[in-house]
């Protein structure tokens, strides 16, 4: 908390009773917490939907299910994208290919030091208890986020390139950690959930 305050981030050290008072509808097994009153979170899907809607009002065109194969370049400027839907011309381009940005940039002779990673999370659509606030259980490397009536439990990040396989040990780490901090939950709550 002290380090956060030195950086200008409001933070308060709370004992177990004060932690419980912040979210009285949820049972937590903790000695205390650090509360960040200005902390916030969002629903990624709602954020992206709102962003897309706003961009459309500004005249942005989206080409879904379209692969970029390369670029047409004049001098030091990109003139067009070569895509599975044909050439796409524009005055300016923004490279937002996520983990594929480095590969796309290579077509332009650029090197972007980027490596794909995957985070693990499990979401309970109808949780036994719904937290009002986010939590980070640092010892277990567990993030807990309420999202539109659901509760998401996020675990570790794995730097794995584009490998989409699931490491079951990491999934078990999440399902075992949740009841340690939130006794109303059990590992069996996650039995039918796919990461």
Residue ranges and their predicted role:
Residues 70-78, 86-195:
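Active-site substrate-recognition segment that forms the wall
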């Amino acid at each position: 908390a002290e380090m956060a305050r030195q950086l200008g981030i409001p933070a308060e050290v709370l004992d177990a009773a004060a932690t419980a008072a912040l979210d009285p509808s949820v049972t937590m097994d903790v000695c205390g917490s650090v509360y960040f009153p200005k902390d916030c979170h969002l629903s990624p899907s709602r954020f992206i939907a709102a962003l897309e809607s706003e961009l459309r009002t500004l005249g942005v065109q989206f080409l879904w299910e379209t692969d970029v194969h390369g670029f047409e370049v004049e001098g030091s400027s990109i003139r067009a994208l070569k895509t599975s839907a044909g050439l796409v011309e524009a005055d300016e381009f923004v490279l937002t290919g996520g983990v594929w940005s480095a590969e796309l940039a290579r077509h332009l002779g650029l090197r972007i030091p980027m490596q794909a990673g995957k985070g693990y999370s499990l979401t309970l659509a109808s949780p036994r208890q719904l937290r009002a606030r986010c939590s980070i259980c640092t010892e277990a490397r567990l993030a807990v986020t309420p999202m539109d009536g659901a509760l998401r439990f996020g675990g570790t990040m794995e730097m794995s390139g584009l490998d989409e396989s699931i490491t079951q040990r990491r999934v078990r780490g999440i399902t075992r950690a949740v009841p340690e901090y939130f006794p109303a939950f059990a590992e069996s709550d996650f039995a039918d959930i796919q990461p």
